């Protein structure tokens, strides 16, 4: 599980130095939790194969990443081309999202579906949304409808929906509770995900 050291990594200066710590400290946690999320997904959607990915930030040449993430998708060679699940970390929180980022192939179809779904009624109010995977800012679930409409109208718009866990909770005392909440987050998002995969 993540620890306070996981969050301190984002204070390290320099691309190589920060990436070295991300690889040694954060990516093994992604793999550990990711396998549990993968098992949960595979049990709930048994007729679909899922693949686990870890962001490598290979295109970066100068700036160290301000966050990092892993993803679960139905594609072996990538994840951004479709709606997918993400487990990631910023300097002050960990998140799990159902993500539509970087102009997925069915962006307009996703937007149309989500605009007509009563998503706010399908999820508990502690769920939040992100409109840009490169920024730490999040918005309440009440902002979902507007963001879903924007996904259909603005080519470069993004939409992620899920939960976050503030860094203060990662003191080693709540690890099993946090993991249970993560699995439950996937379960709550599954009905939405399954509808997205049908479009």
UniProtKB/Swiss-Prot annotation:
The highest taxon in the source lineage is Bacteria
InterPro entries (alphabetical): UPF0637, UPF0637_domain_sf
- A Pfam family that this protein carries is DUF1054
Its family?
Answer: Belongs to the UPF0637 family.
Under what name is this protein listed? UPF0637 protein llmg_1936
Task: Identify the species of origin.
Answer: Lactococcus lactis subsp. cremoris (strain MG1363)
Lineage of source species: Bacteria, Bacillati, Bacillota, Bacilli, Lactobacillales
